[in-house]
Amino acid sequence: MPSASVKLTPNPKNIYIAPFDTSTAKWMVGRDGIELVNFKEDFQTNFTHQLQTRLEKLAPTEMRWVNDLPDHGWLVTGEFTTVDQGSRALRTAVGLGFGETTLQTTVYVYDLDVSKTQYILSFRTGVPDPKHDTGAGSGSFPAGLSALGEPISTATGLGSGLKLDTTRTCREIVAILAQYM
């Protein structure tokens, strides 16, 4: 558990990303065996690439593995906790939050100037706020609204799926880290 007195060094020269752990997540994606293994690998790769692209807006960003870390910068890693592909058929036919997808992560941020073994910041993404959650739609946004408050079509299933949840999760991570720049 990080100490409340230890803070992230602002404006790191570099941000590093280690692949998020896929081993402990609850995977509800309609696959098993080698198909599930391949899905997890592809999902992790796509997620990491999108996160790297978005973190580049804050500082130069590159992939690193935990056993090959420099002495300065931030390391962003974490674990997928829930990956639920939902039901495209229900999203398309019924809408209104039925068949929703879910992507939840726990993110750990290490300040390599302070420690390579103890994270400084931890937060969860994709977890609805019970005070504001309507119980409908992916993530914590009301059914029929995107993360930007723009209307989405529930009739065609647009604005749904793990691809959108991945984009939303990466944006959420970057928005939180931007507060520490």
Which role does the model predict for each range below?
Residues M1-T53, R124, G137-M181:
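A structural "domain/chain start" motif
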Residues L58-P70:
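Short beta-strand->alpha-helix linker/helix-N-cap micro-motif
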Residues D42-K57, L103-S115:
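A short, hydrophobic secondary-structure junction motif
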Residues P2, E62-R64, R91-T92:
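Short structured motifs
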Residues K7-T9, L55, P70, G99:
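A generic structural signal for short, solvent-exposed coil/turn residues
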Residues N67-G135:
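Surface-exposed short loop/turn segments
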